[in-house]
Amino acid sequence: MEAQRVVDCHVHVFDPQRFPYRPDTFYAPAGQELGTPARLRTVLDAHGVEHALLVGPNSGYGEDNRCLLDTLAAAAGRYRGMAVVANSTSRAELAELRAAGVSGVTVNAALLGVGYYADAGGLLADLAALDMIADVQVVDDQLVELAPLLERSGVRVHVDHCGRPDPGAGLGAAGFRELLRWGASARAVVKLSGCVKVSREPYPHRDLLPFVRALVDAFGPDRCVWGSDWPFLRMPERVDYGPLLTLLAEQVPDADARRRILWDTPVREYGLGGGSAQVAEGQCEHEPGAAPG
């Protein structure tokens, strides 16, 4: 049987020896949390993961994207990126990032609050015009408040970590219901990621199983992707990569659905595989403003 091809759609890189952290950083990853490009490559190679999406971290670097861009440039199309930018970033600056392999920018309301993005309408509209992505991270019911801004802009939206649901609040929590509603939008994709961050239980994180299955039902495997969240910030002990990858077989038992989640959907959404050269030249698989998938 042919091995399943894999794209990891949520990893971070930290290389403070080459790219020092900002002095005003929210958090300075250290020790087991460090994820240099060399370490990332070793982990991905060991588990047969062909591509990855590098999500610019607010921890350590914030709007300093030099480490991210250097890693993208050195990887010859293996990676795509999500940059952290100011709300005032111009369309020309976004286009430069796109040409460097950046697929979109982060909207981290979980850390910065929904109010931080009150003046981000222009940024989101420019992302939409360039067919780039808003990589959204929310907690609790923040998506309910953030949704109108995202919908008005027409931007493609990728939601991190299953929407970071509270397992104790259940499937009926307002924020999770809002995320399920987004399953009807052709512009939205959800990342089946962050199990270690969100779960209240040890591996295999069975308290998240109903949430993952509800998301796959709502979005379909053509608008779900998988991510590890390596190198697992703020964890009290080292987290093993391999078990998180194999856990998806329990969460999504259907092999064809897993194939689409692990490969087909991320290759399409991030312009990987055969589309690498076109994206590197600043072109996109989707027509600007068109709905993905």
Give the residues covered by each predicted segment.
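Mid-to-C-terminal alpha-helical segments outside catalytic/metal-binding sites
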Residues: 2-7, 30-51, 214, 219-225, ...
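Active-site gating/metal-coordination segments in enzymes
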Residues: 62-141, 148-151, 191, 195
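Divalent metal-dependent hydrolysis catalytic cores, especially in the metallo-beta-lactamase
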Residues: 25-33, 38-61, 78-84, 102-110, ...
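Catalytic pocket-lining loop regions of alpha/beta-barrel enzymes
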Residues: 117-225
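Short, acidic/polar
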Residues: 34-43, 88-97, 175
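Conserved, mostly hydrophobic/aromatic
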Residues: 10, 44, 68, 127, ...
